Each structure stands twice: as structure tokens, then as C-alpha cells.
Amino acid sequence: MPHSSPGAPLDPVAFIHSQIRTVPDWPQPGVQFRDITTLLQSPKALRILVDLFVERYVDAKLDYVAGLDARGFIIAPIVAYELSVGFVPIRKVGKLPYKTRSESYDLEYGSATVEIHEDACRPGDRVIIMDDLIATGGTMMAGRNLLQRLGAVVVEGAAIIDLPDLGGSTLLRNAGLPVYTVTEFAGH
């Protein structure tokens, strides 16, 4: 259950937004990298962030929170713990030790593949899928497809940040996946 954050700001979303550092021209020129490590370093900001997700999903009757490799692994297990549900990792190819299902998706230059253990969830299990941000939506779409192939009901895709100019959240919504993000940044 959510904890009361001492000295919580009146506008928690604006506060979370203010805690995210922008690193210009990283990892390549023209990219404005949205760095969540500054948010994570603040106990107050982390508590408020987790509370926002927990308040949203406390009544969703979830079975699991799935996290996308790698930064989705930071917040998703905390939210799963607070909701008293399991955590399902969706990893880059070759990182899971047991039998897996895989899903490839397109990148700007090439493609990538993510995997899930074939016994990660059961048909009918209710799952949200989490990442740090939604850019093009490719990773979250691949994660959703994997979960659905296992028979899970993917309730929603969730992230701290949306980069709406890159079109990922629109792509996901148009594919039938509801999306929740705490904040958004223009550009890429």
C-alpha cells in the first residue's frame, strides 16, 4: 500500500519531472537522454514515484508486473513488491537460463530480440508491463506480444517517461495496449 511521503509536493508529477536529468548529445549527437538516476538517488522522489504507480494499480487485480531489460528492472520489482504480486523479467536475447519464447522488433538501424521464460505466467494472468520510458514503443510491443503468447492479459503498459514525439505511445495505443506514463518530454 502507498506510504505517506513526509513533505510530499503538492504536484507529484511536476516533482518527478523535475528530478529527471537531461543529458544532451548522449549517446549520440542530437539525442536528449532522459536520465532517471537522479530521480532514483532521491529517497523522496523514489517513494513518490512508486506511490504513483501503486495508487494506479492497487485495485487492478494484477498477478504480475513485467519489467523490460534493463531500466524497467529498476522500478518494476519495487512496484511488484508493493502490490504483493510477482515480477517477470523480459530480457535481451541469451540472458535467461531456462526455456524461452522470443520476439524480435525493429530498431532505427537493425533489429533486437527480447525473451521471456516460457513458464513466466499462465493463461489469464493479469500483467502490467513496465519500462523507464517509451520512445518508439518497439520494446514494449515485443514484451506485450510475448506475454500474450503465454496467454496473459496485458492490462497496461507503464513507464516513467513518454517521448510522444517519437510516436511509441501512440503506436501502442493504436495496437490496443493502454499506456500510462508519469510525465513526458518533448523531442527525443
From Swiss-Prot:
* Biological process annotations from GO: adenine salvage; AMP salvage; purine ribonucleoside salvage
The record's section on SUPFAM superfamilies has:
PRTase-like
Pathway, according to UniProt? Answer: Purine metabolism; AMP biosynthesis via salvage pathway; AMP from adenine: step 1/1
The transmembrane segments are none
The record's catalysed reaction(s) read: AMP + diphosphate = 5-phospho-alpha-D-ribose 1-diphosphate + adenine
Q: Which UniProt keywords apply?
A: Cytoplasm, Glycosyltransferase, Purine salvage, Transferase
Cellular compartments annotated: Cytoplasm
- InterPro entries xrefs: Ade_phspho_trans, Adenine_PRTase, PRibTrfase_dom, PRTase-like
Q: Per its record, what are the GO molecular function terms?
A: adenine phosphoribosyltransferase activity
Record-linked Pfam families: Pribosyltran
- Top-level EC class as recorded in UniProt: transferase
What Enzyme Commission number does this protein have?
A: 2.4.2.7
Q: Which GO terms describe its cellular component?
A: cytosol
Q: How does this protein assemble?
A: Homodimer.
Q: Which NCBIfam families match?
A: apt, PRK02304.1-3, PRK02304.1-5
**Its family?**
Belongs to the purine/pyrimidine phosphoribosyltransferase family.
The protein's job, in short, is:
Catalyzes a salvage reaction resulting in the formation of AMP, that is energically less costly than de novo synthesis.
Supply the name of the protein. Adenine phosphoribosyltransferase
Species of provenance? Burkholderia ambifaria (strain MC40-6)
Task: Identify the gene encoding this protein.
Answer: apt
